[in-house]
Amino acid sequence: MFVLREVAAQFERPAILFSGGKDSIVVTHLAAKAFAPARIPMPLVHIDTGHNFPETIEFRDALAERLGVQLIVGSVQDTIDGGRVREETGAQASRNRLQIATLLETIENGKYDACIGGARRDEEKARAKERFFSHRDDFGQWDPKNQRPELWNLFNGKHMPGENFRVFPLNNWTELDIWNYITREQIALPSLYYAHQRMCVVRDGVILAHSEYLPQREGETPEMMQIRFRTLGDLTITGAIESDANTLEKITAEVAATRVTER
């Protein structure tokens, strides 16, 4: 929570990048505690690709209303319609990469100088180099050689006009830490994280939710499976796992026993 308070103290226009996944939900929960009894003093920024799970969008809207926090939505479809990016086609088509342009536009339009995210170092190799305060230049680029020291939990948020920071309060948390915290605090999550029945296709060894956004390959047959999601993103790229974990306690035990990362 001290990282969130440090952001509020050092930056003029901070925002929380909210994906609707468990990590951004935990960040938002921590922000609510950090600034209580006041409201969260920064908006939630969500980049809507148009290919999100409906459950994610419903949860996002309900959470913003319950907390009384401003919700800013950047639309990938608007970016496509404006001719600033081109829609991908084919069986591997995804809007995952396209959302980068929408995010940068949203940051620029909102003049946000600090964007708080839920990324963790244990998720993938690229994120292992991230600091708590991660500097971005005026083109939105990250240079690992141009990061500030963070000795003794001292953070340097100084930046030139047009530059900004990504801030990662959960940088040193693990997936198990996240679930232990969610279980302890009894934090509400989208139903997608719990075991449920869903029509799926298995593609290249990955279980994907069957949807109108997922072009079906020849020979693929959707089948009903009992699955849950460890991480949430677009319908077209978010892989599921077969599971019967339908409570927080079962999910936490499942995560503790797994030897495969969520990404």
Residue ranges and their predicted role:
Residues 1-263:
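Nucleotide-activated chemistry modules centered on ATP-dependent adenylation/adenylyltransferase
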